[in-house]
Amino acid sequence: MVARSRMGGPWSRAQRVARAFQDAGHEVALAWGDDGNCVNPVAPTLEIPVPSPLGLPDAIARHTFPLASRLGLMGRKPVHSFEEVLWLTGALDERYTRAAVELLRTHMCATRPDVVYSEFNLAAVVAARAEGIPCVGSGSQPTTTAYASSPRKSAGIRRLLREMGMPAPASSLTILEGMWRRFIPSCPTLEPQAGERAVYCGFLDEPPALTPRPRDCVLVYFGAGSVPAGVAVRAGRELAEMLSCDVYVAGVSEAVQAVGDREVTCAPRFDFAELLPRARVFVHHGGQNSVMDALTYEVPQIIVPGRVFERRFNAEAVENARCGLSVRASKPALIAHAACALIDEPALTSGIRGVRAELRSLGGGARIVREVEELVG
């Protein structure tokens, strides 16, 4: 999945899957786009076009959407389904999909891959089906039509499919659900109804061994656009004061603020693998990668999902599994009080080790490779 908005999850998952196939001795090509998310590819690449949000002219979209993200304006619009996400990013635009499918088909026709793996890329599934190539890919419970869909957003895709002589389901999500296998980077405890042809694979990479060390900081990361940068920084200050520890706020401009004898360090990005083993709490937006990162290092989670369907699903799943708490309103004081509650009440995080063990047992990227090898022979 390529998109103009800042979303590192799809690319990082695609990279991990690619490495798993490489480790098993397979040749891999990565389709990528100039969207600011696709960097440092681990395999040879094929450049594909990047959709323009809402089908707007590219020159406008390049400037307006990053600005809206920084101001937190994106978080004010409810997003009810993954179909709406595809529409907002421009991935359902008929002209874009036609161009992407043609380019991908040309590449597939020339190279004849044994299988296509789609990281929520609709054009890849359509192109593979048109070329008669097996297609598998990533999936999740909240991206199924049974969970939520918005068929009115997919009229252009239906026209294109009819023109290509293919079935044109009401919802574009049905196309993604029709892949030969759907690999769920989660577990039944968190996503009990993942849909047809679902294979749970848990952590894509083997999690590191955990060694005892002081938990002496809090990490805050709200992703792209769901919470204004100023609110994230104020939440960091509240957390530093109430928990009496240093706080790191990712996804904002560089700064260091003193709160008593503690510091709130802000930066566009940090190495989470260095900070999470030290973290008492991880406060985040509910993205899939953030949820898995917290569980990897057995860190209690505070999720502030905003008005996005998938993040709300993840927040509820984490809370029900006793791995953290959700806070619906992005108010710094509420976030800090929830963090205190997590630390003071062990029962609220009593499920973390069990869920981590379940995720670890499901096979990860190696499981994906084995399933695909059996599928295509």
Residue ranges and their predicted role:
Residues 3-15, 39, 225-230:
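A short, glycine/small-residue-rich beta-strand->loop->alpha-helix junction that serves as a flexible
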Residues 18, 198-281:
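Donor-nucleotide binding loops and adjacent catalytic segments primarily
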Residues 116-119, 269-315:
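A donor-sugar binding/catalytic signature common to diverse glycosyltransferases
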Residues 23-24, 28-88:
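Conserved nucleotide-sugar phosphate-binding/catalytic loop shared by glycosyltransferases and other
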